[in-house]
Design a protein with these regions (language model features):
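Short beta-rich binding modules
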Residues: 1-140
């Protein structure tokens, strides 16, 4: 018998959010070779985070929704805003450990997009520092 089970996180993965700024906890940052391309070898830096609450209103309606996105060594400039949101001053020639973001919180604008014919949540590299005056407010 092919028996499977789902975690709460698995079930939340398919939940579409209303486009907005969300407070997100960075769960993991990885590193893996990207698929071969005509541009040559590159490295992906996959990031997984979890929505905590709306970054403007504190609403927790989408609490627990996981988000996945990538940085790539061929377009690493997209990581500048990510690092800046943590207060890092990004300078040419300086090395940064993306993994140091694990466990930290950031505000991310989450959009909706269509991928392979279905609606998905999309992180399009819009980041800002956490606004400490905004805290979680339980959904009514």
């Amino acid at each position: 018998m092919a028996t499977i089970s789902f975690s709460e996180r698995d079930l939340m993965r398919g939940k579409n959010v209303t486009p907005a700024w969300y407070r997100v906890k960075i769960e993991t940052v990885g590193e893996a070779p990207a698929k071969a391309s005509e541009k040559g070898p590159s490295t992906n830096y996959p990031v997984e985070g979890t929505i905590l609450f709306n970054g403007d209103t504190g609403d927790t309606a989408f609490k627990g929704v996981p988000l996945d996105w990538n940085f790539n060594s061929k377009a690493i400039g997209f990581a500048v805003g990510f690092l800046a949101a943590f207060g890092v001053e990004v300078k040419a020639g300086t090395r940064f450990d993306l993994k140091s973001a694990e466990g930290r919180e950031i505000d991310i604008f989450v959009e909706n997009d269509t991928w392979q014919g279905r609606l998905v949540n999309r992180v399009n590299h819009k980041y800002r520092a956490v606004r400490p005056e905004v805290t979680a407010v339980a959904a009514a």
